[in-house]
Amino acid sequence: MSDLLTKRSVADIQHLIWLSLGGGSTECIPNVSYGFFREKGMEADLVYITPYGYLHEFEIKRSKSDFLADFKKPVFHGDVRIQKLTFVLPEALAGEWLKQWCADHYKEFRRSFDFWFYPEEGMLKRPRHYGADPKCKYDLEYYFTDEMVREIDENDRDLPYRRRLFAEERSALYRLCMIRFWNNPRRVEIKTAPKEQSIGLFENADEGKGEK
């Protein structure tokens, strides 16, 4: 029995992330596999190339079980090019359950990360960098106390030093992005689809093969 908490597709959520990062020429590449990453079994639902040349990885989850399964993997987003990791979760997971889960398991976290949340309609809800409220379930301070952050940061420091992408690595990601586009049977709809409709680059023939 499915425990999905959303009707939104992975492609739709990828599109929301792209829009939230600025849309337009924002450098986002969907569905990056172990062919690019050096660690066996590692893959990313979406990576964003930051203005400074690092990678920001987004892990999209559509159910509680899929989110929990990520923390049982032997490989946990440790590629040296990933500067930041974000879990993009259904809004239904925001709140007391996730807060208690973080409190119970933070000593096991192998690196720092944050949460973004998506509702069934509308745009992503992102944590505030300024004016964050520990009582707001969309801000990180709601989930992590200062003590928890310090301990997680200690684990984070054990990871290899992060580095910027080399030119050939950026080129490899651009090629992958083009493959995703031209292998998309619905690419012709991009020109006519409403701006907020999530089709095109972030939708591919593999959609639906696995639950997230």
Language model features by range: what are they?
Residues 3, 19, 103-212:
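Non-catalytic C-terminal interaction segments of nucleic acid-processing enzymes
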Residues 1-42, 49-50:
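Acidic-basic catalytic patches of nuclease active cores, encompassing PD-(D/E)XK
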Residues 9, 63, 165-166:
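Helix N-terminus capping/helix-initiation residues
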Residues 14, 45, 70-74:
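A generic local structural motif
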Residues 43, 47, 55-59:
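Short hydrophobic-acidic sequence motifs that mark active-site Asp/Glu residues
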Residues 47-49, 88:
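Short hydrophobic/aromatic beta-strand micro-patches
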Residues 23, 55, 61-121:
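Catalytic cores of nucleic-acid endonucleases
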Residues 15, 56, 83, 197-200:
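Active-site-proximal helix/loop capping residues that flank conserved catalytic or ligand/cofactor
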